[in-house]
Amino acid sequence: MESDIINTNLLKSIEGKKRELDAFRPFSPEIARKLDEQFTIEWTYNSNAIEGNTLTLQETDLVINRGLTIGNKTLKEHFEAINHKEVIQFLYDFVKKKKTLDENVILAIHKIILKNIRDMDAGHYRNANVMIMGAVHLPPSAIKIPKLMEEFMEWYYEHKSKLSIVELAGWVHYKLVYIHPFIDGNGRMARLLMNLILLQNGYPPAVILNIDRRKYYQVLKEADREQYNNYFNFIGRSIERSLLIYLNALKSKNDKEDRYGYISLQEATKLCEYGIEYLSYLARTGRLKAIKIRRNWMTT
């Protein structure tokens, strides 16, 4: 599919990897479970970190999967992690049941995001005007929000079959950020809604990395000036990264383990999209099949 706002070669690469991914379906329950677990941790950590949450990747895992409390971290940061995991499960269930997206679903997602954090605002459009720090765009006044969200849903249903999934997901994300319908949680809401679109269409969730936070905000600013190319290419690369992670996991599962033997985690980083720190953490916590030889973790 040709596109004026995303690099054509990038879009073709994404769609090619999606076809390759579809060829592996149905996924084995073990692989599907492990990928869901890894993406839930990474997605939760990065999306919250972009908004200023100081929980590390490992701490996020301890909070959402083991129910632990982290010293010197705020209660709000704990709830942000817990709530985000709950929303992700909500999205997976929503997709599995093939439900239809509407404003009530958006409000239900937001209610979970701010649960035990700002209960009075959770699941409600804002009734006050807001500013986005460092942005060139001033969000619309609160009185316009209901009408704008109604138009947003009309736009979505008009364009969902006309655009590529990558473009549709990118536009949904950008338009929600632009409207800024909530008093808090707009960034997380936009990224979750983008991923709901991807999941509904058989894509893995796209994780915008905290290390790319500055670039992320920069391309959003450019989009506010109606310069969309860098923004959509940024979103496209995030989607492609997730596809690569899925494909590498599925291909590794299909290969005979004794064909390769054990390799170091440093070598493994060249075969996947994860860094040495994250692979080491997965090995230590038993989420990555690995053995320790002397002082070094080795994996297949």
What does each model-identified segment do?
Residues 1-184, 188-300:
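FIC/Doc superfamily catalytic core
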